[in-house]
């Protein structure tokens, strides 16, 4: 079912989204289309992405996009997966691995709803949330999906398709 929802949402987005456009969501129901500027990293940034798992289509598709973007922009991306949800200790150990590797930022798809002592652990490394919100003031930015639209658009499509 997740795959179907993802595909339907992707189809909805195709009309507004292309390689040159971004959707900026203002709230659950309103977005504007913004042109994106093609970028190339001036140096090989070292980014470390932590995912709860790579066992389902959602995180696999996110990882595919991240890998493609890293390749396209000339960024060195290290990916670690925690083996499932509720794996705080695993992800804390992975942050240490990222720091030893020389990561310049952490892209955190948290496996838990809170991440105690995140500030102490990452020190000055920027943290960008991937999908799962922590609501931690340390987090610099968040990349996610509009959850309302993820359900609404496939439902809307199915209603229209059934007529």
Language-model features, listed with the residues they occupy:
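Positively charged n-region of N-terminal signal peptides that target proteins for export
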Residues: 1-4
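Boundary at the C-terminal end of the N-terminal hydrophobic targeting segment
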Residues: 16-18
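Extracytoplasmic "Venus flytrap"
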Residues: 25-36, 46-65, 69, 78-89, ...
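Bacterial carbohydrate/catabolite-sensing allosteric modules
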Residues: 47, 72-73, 141-163
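Periplasmic-binding protein-like
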Residues: 49, 99-110, 128-130
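Short, well-structured alpha-helical segments in soluble
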Residues: 88-103
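Flexible loop/hinge segments that line or gate small-molecule binding clefts
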Residues: 113-149, 160
């Amino acid at each position: 079912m997740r795959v179907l929802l993802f595909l339907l949402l992707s189809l909805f987005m195709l009309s507004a989204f292309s390689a040159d456009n971004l959707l900026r969501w203002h709230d659950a129901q309103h977005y504007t289309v913004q042109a994106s500027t093609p970028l190339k990293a001036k140096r090989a940034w070292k980014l470390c992405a932590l995912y709860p798992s790579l066992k389902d289509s959602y995180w696999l598709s996110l990882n595919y996009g991240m890998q493609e973007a890293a390749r396209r922009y000339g960024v060195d991306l290290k990916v670690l997966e925690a083996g499932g949800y509720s794996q705080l200790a695993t992800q804390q150990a992975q942050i240490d691995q990222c720091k030893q590797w020389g990561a310049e930022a952490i892209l955190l798809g948290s496996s838990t709803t809170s991440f105690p002592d995140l500030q102490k652990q990452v020190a000055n490394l920027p943290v960008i949330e991937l999908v799962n919100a922590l609501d931690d003031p340390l987090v610099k930015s968040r990349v996610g999906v509009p959850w309302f639209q993820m359900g609404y658009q496939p439902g809307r499509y199915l209603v229209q398709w059934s007529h």
